[in-house]
Amino acid sequence: MNDYANITQITLLVRRLDIGTKVIRVRQHSQENQLFKYRKDLSYPPKEKVKLARANMDGQPMFYGAVFSNFCINDNPRLTCLLETNKEVLDDTFVGKKDLTYSLWLNKREINLFVIPVFDSYPHPAKDFEWYYELWKELMQDDRINKEQINVLKELSRHFSLTGEKKEEENSYAYTADFTTHLFKTHPEIDGIIYPSVRLKEEGIGAVSYTHLTLP
């Protein structure tokens, strides 16, 4: 078992999404002039098409999306989704066309998302994560988290801050996906995770959930 197993036994900081909270999601088109007419086309991907990603193993569907900041009035979850799913946006050498469909979802019940701590892995995280990090520091100062657990949390934060695209980062997705899987198994009250968007210079807020949301 990985060394992060014991951190799921400590006090978890959670962001709760109230009923009706907006979640933005995007899907890339696989062909020109493609239209999605059904909710299922924009929801969870088919199991057989799911590959290893930041919070899931091969064949393990998860609901990826972006949520609005509680602090920043100019927050744009659509931009977060775009950058998280299309690395070509930041590639000056890319020439071509890509079609996308955005969808707006509302959660049917309260959803509890485990907040990934930022530590020093994120130079400029969204204020939402800075606020939670202050709570993490209180836990550490009160000795409710020991040094070993702190080191594991820092390592977890570091892996979440990587895109997994560079050769030296290729194991990061396996690490974070394994953690997320273990978290859900040991804490059924946790519905997903929330983390800073790396490709938006940590300003966006990404969220992953395995619970069901619905189109408005």
List each language-model region with its residue ranges.
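Phosphate-interacting basic helix/loop segments used at nucleotide- and nucleic-acid interfaces
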Residues: 172-182
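Short, glycine-/Ser/Thr-/acidic-enriched flexible segments
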Residues: 31, 69-70, 198-200
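Extended serine/threonine-enriched, polar tracts that run as long, contiguous segments within proteins
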Residues: 189-201
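Compositionally biased, low-complexity/repeat regions
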Residues: 11-13, 118-119, 198
